[in-house]
Design a protein with these regions (language model features):
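A conserved acidic beta->alpha catalytic loop
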Residues: 2-11
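A short, conserved beta-strand element in the Rossmann-like catalytic core
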Residues: 4, 33, 61
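Acidic-histidine catalytic/liganding microenvironments
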Residues: 16-20, 76
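Acceptor/aglycone-binding surface of glycosyltransferases and processive sugar-polymer synthases
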Residues: 24, 28-47, 52, 64-147, ...
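Residue-level signature of catalytic and energy-coupling elements of molecular machines
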Residues: 41, 59, 131, 157, ...
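Catalytic donor-sugar/metal-binding loop of nucleotide-sugar-dependent glycosyltransferases
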Residues: 118, 142-145, 154-172
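DNA-recognition element of transcription regulators
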Residues: 151
Length: 175
């Protein structure tokens, strides 16, 4: 999803789409926010009959090598939604700046209170996967469309009694 980018993102997506029919470009103009971009992608996954939708930002903070680890719990029926967690593994936390770790700790605590997912950590991590079955039950247009999207999505997942699993992935910045 190209959410109103002013760089060459749209052109790059279109180029990939010409070479690979599995790439389906979605463009927002103007920028509508991270939540709106994710919602557009989710709606397209449902419309195209996908079984699982994954979110991996284009800023190189999410290593594609960890995508199978996010998909497996859903494929195996152990989760409806999986999300990356940079905090579970001490070695993975080393790449996270101290100020970001502090802020993440506060947001994690507040999200646990709001969502009811007490075992969950690192709610700001956007490397996620969700079953399309779960998406079909969620009121996608009612979920906050801005930067707090992931936090609000967790609240909605709990309202709909969905199983959420954290998956250990390394923090990756500045690459």
């Amino acid at each position: 999803v190209n959410d109103g980018s002013s760089d060459r993102t749209g052109e790059i997506i279109e180029d990939y789409a010409r070479r690979d029919p599995r790439v389906v470009p979605i463009h927002h103009s103007p920028n509508r926010g991270v939540g709106a971009a994710i919602t557009s992608g989710y709606k397209r996954a449902v419309a195209d009959g996908m079984e699982i939708a994954a979110v991996m930002a284009g800023d190189n903070q999410m290593d594609p090598a960890y995508l199978p680890a996010l998909l497996d719990p859903i494929v195996e029926g152990r989760a409806d939604y999986t999300k990356g967690n940079r905090l579970i593994n001490e070695a993975y936390r080393k790449g996270m700046p101290a100020w970001r770790s502090f802020g993440n700790s506060i947001l994690t605590f507040l999200t646990k209170i709001a969502s009811g997912y007490w075992q969950m950590m690192d709610p700001q991590n956007g490397y996620t996967a969700i079953s399309v079955k779960a998406l079909a039950e969620l009121p996608l247009d009612s979920i906050y469309q801005g930067y707090g999207y992931y936090n609000n999505l967790l609240v909605w997942l709990n309202i709909h009694n969905m199983t959420v699993r954290d998956v250990a992935i390394p923090a990756r910045y500045g690459r």
